[in-house]
From Swiss-Prot:
The keyword rRNA-binding applies. Belongs to the universal ribosomal protein uS13 family. SUPFAM superfamilies: S13-like H2TH domain (SSF46946). One of its GO terms (molecular function) is structural constituent of ribosome. Pfam families: Ribosomal_S13. Residues 94-121 are annotated as: Disordered. This is Small ribosomal subunit protein uS13. Part of the 30S ribosomal subunit. Forms a loose heterodimer with protein S19. Forms two bridges to the 50S subunit in the 70S ribosome. InterPro entries: Rbsml_uS13_C, Ribosomal_uS13, Ribosomal_uS13-like_H2TH, Ribosomal_uS13_bac-type, Ribosomal_uS13_CS. It comes from the Bacteria. GO terms for biological process: translation. GO terms for cellular component: cytosol; small ribosomal subunit. It comes from Streptococcus sanguinis (strain SK36). Residues 106-121 have a biased composition (Basic residues).
Length: 121
């Protein structure tokens, strides 16, 4: 297994798919990285030469991925919460941030439903 950006990428898959195992690299970014590195998308990871691996590593190092990207996303969310913006308040309350309705759904964000005591007989 080759290690790129601190992540073991699978040997038996095509390089373009294997790079998507790195947080922050999807299929479009993976294709751009391989084009810039001059590596074919169809080649398997186990068939890469050392020079090709180094070229891919250089391209990936130029992009914010893994820990740096996670840290930036978390800092952005904390900043929104500190300035008291609508999005920050929604994050703080654990509600959907992007305008979804909460009357019926949003269970993923709100957590498990809590039963309310009904009318006693």
């Amino acid at each position: 297994m080759a290690r790129i950006a601190g992540v073991d990428i699978p040997n038996d898959k095509r390089v373009v798919v294997s790079l998507t195992y790195v947080y922050g690299i999807g299929l479009p970014t993976s294709k751009k990285i391989l084009a810039a590195a001059g590596v074919s998308e169809d080649i398997r990871v186990k068939d890469l030469t050392i020079e090709q691996e180094d070229a891919i590593r250089r391209e990936v190092d130029a992009i914010k991925v893994e820990g740096d990207l996670r840290r930036e996303v978390n800092l952005n969310i904390k900043r929104l919460m500190e300035i008291g913006s609508y999005r920050g308040i929604r994050h703080r309350r654990g509600l959907p941030v992007r305008g979804q309705n909460t009357k019926n759904n949003a269970r993923t964000r709100k957590g498990k439903a809590v039963a309310i005591a009904g009318k006693k007989k």
